[in-house]
Swiss-Prot record:
Pathway: Lipid metabolism; polyunsaturated fatty acid biosynthesis
InterPro entries: Cyt_B5-like_heme/steroid-bd, Cyt_B5-like_heme/steroid_sf, FA_desaturase_dom, Fatty_acid_desaturase
Entry's transmembrane regions: 122-142, 146-170, 268-288, 306-326
Lumenal side: 143-145, 289-305
One of the protein's GO biological processes: icosanoid biosynthetic process
EC number: 1.14.19.44
Catalytic class of the enzyme: oxidoreductase
Motif Histidine box-2: where in chain: 216-220
Name of this protein: Acyl-CoA (8-3)-desaturase
Membrane topology, Cytoplasmic segments: 1-121, 171-267, 327-444
A molecular-function term among this protein's GO annotations: omega-6 fatty acid desaturase activity
UniProt organism field: Homo sapiens
């Protein structure tokens, strides 16, 4: 039987703390009971998951596991957070128990924690506010230039097209900037990060911050882990992803789509369709279904501003055409950039590996250049971003050599490639996994 939470908490804080083994912790990973370990302390999060500020699922994905490194990675004020966690404390690991499970590489984990301490001493977790101010200003300038294009040159085809391209750049770049605020990587307090996150994602993009938090934090916690990373939820209903999952799907004789042709239909239902045909409508369902009225209010300000700005110039019909062309262009930009770092990498069920191995097997980089940095919002440094999600993006290139050294020492592949090669690898990986599915479907 599980220990009584009140009694266990009292025992944990008294002179004789309650001790647990990893087997006991691992058993508490289901819907009824959820425990996790941080710095050898055992916490009962069964009731807390619904109140977790980062979302119920992201913390639940570590139920029954050690969560020390993700805890450090995601929180910017760990001391304050730990005070709130005291009410969840039920004991600690027995002295003879290792600090984390045998599936995790101890030497690699210890050295990564030393690297993190070095990074903090170097000041690489501190943001340059001028960088982010200039980044916001460049987005606002592009936004203004889009409107001025129609106002000055009229609404004929070429000005209309240029306006659409500029607005798609605004949307893409605002997407990268909201990502910075969402990860708490700009300000030292959560309050200001959250406020600017609402402004950028809500007012400049028309999307809800709560939806982004709910989806994106899960992705970072368990990247490319089936049923834990929502970014690969298109498996199996639209695509067969990864070698392991594709073969598994084929052996089960499941066929929701002709996966052996997925590298072809990706161009139809992937980049052009994700935002205008799915996200555009789902975000409203999300905020209304979950009663996220603050998010909805921020979103409405975007649509009101966009409507009042462009309808007087274009009329309603052309305005709607402009809106969906922008969403179409933005969708292509967004999908190619976000998928190039993950789809070609290892995709599997959660194997409860250490933090570094979890992130490195699921991510790759794209070579640094001024264009690549701007075009991808510095997500060409995906490895560094995943290891240090609250690090300001302008410091990724500074920590990259240290990460490469750590990977080389432990025989971990650190992948970095040209931008076009990264795009091509998406198609190559889809073709390969589709063929693996077909072979397993027909012959195994």
């Amino acid at each position: 039987m599980a220990p009584d939470p009140v009694a266990a908490e009292t025992a944990a804080q008294g002179p004789t703390p309650r001790y647990f083994t990893w087997d006991e912790v691992a058993q508490r990973s289901g819907c009824e009971e959820r425990w996790l370990v941080i710095d050898r302390k055992v916490y009962n999060i069964s009731e807390f998951t619904r109140r977790h500020p980062g979302g119920s699922r992201v913390i639940s994905h570590y139920a029954g596991q050690d969560a020390t490194d993700p805890f450090v990675a995601f929180h910017i004020n760990k001391g304050l957070v730990k005070k709130y966690m005291n009410s969840l404390l039920i004991g600690e690991l027995s002295p003879e128990q290792p600090s984390f499970e045998p599936t995790k590489n101890k030497e690699l984990t210890d050295e990564f924690r030393e690297l993190r301490a070095t990074v903090e001493r170097m000041g690489l977790m501190k943001a340059n506010h001028v960088f982010f101010l200039l980044y916001l200003l460049h987005i606002l300038l592009l936004d203004g230039a889009a409107w001025l294009t129609l106002w000055v040159f009229g609404t004929s085809f070429l000005p209309f097209l240029l306006c659409a391209v500029l607005l798609s750049a605004v949307q893409a770049q605002a997407g990268w900037l909201q990502h910075d605020f969402g990860h708490l990587s700009v300000f030292s307090t959560s309050k200001w990060n959250h406020l600017l996150h609402h402004f950028v994602i809500g007012h400049l993009k028309g999307a809800p911050a709560s939806w982004w938090n709910h989806m994106h934090f899960q992705h970072h916690a368990k990247p490319n882990c089936f049923r834990k990373d929502p970014d690969i939820n298109m498996h199996p209903f639209f695509f067969a992803l990864g070698k392991i999952l594709s073969v598994e799907l084929g052996k089960q004789k499941k066929k929701y789509m002709p996966y052996n042709h997925q590298h072809k239909y990706f161009f139809l239902i992937g980049p052009p369709a994700l935002l205008p045909l799915y996200f555009q409508w789902y975000i409203f369902y999300f905020v209304i279904q979950r009663k996220k009225w603050v998010d909805l209010a921020w979103m409405i300000t975007f649509y009101v501003r966009f409507f009042l700005t462009y309808v007087p110039l274009l009329g309603l019909k052309a305005f709607l055409g402009l809106f969906f062309i922008v969403r179409f262009l933005e969708s292509n930009w967004f999908v190619w950039v976000t998928q190039m770092n993950h789809i070609p990498m290892h995709i599997d069920h959660d194997r409860n590996m250490d933090w570094v191995s979890t992130q490195l097997q699921a991510t790759c980089n794209v070579h640094k250049s001024a264009f690549n940095d701007w075009f991808s919002g510095h997500l060409n440094f995906q490895i560094e971003h995943h290891l240090f999600p609250t690090m300001p993006r302008h410091n990724y290139h500074k920590v990259a050599p240290l990460v490469q050294s750590l990977c080389a020492k432990h025989g971990i592949e650190y992948q970095s490639k040209p931008l076009l090669s990264a795009f091509a690898d998406i198609i190559h990986s889809l073709k390969e996994s589709g063929q693996l599915w077909l072979d397993a479907y027909l012959h195994q």
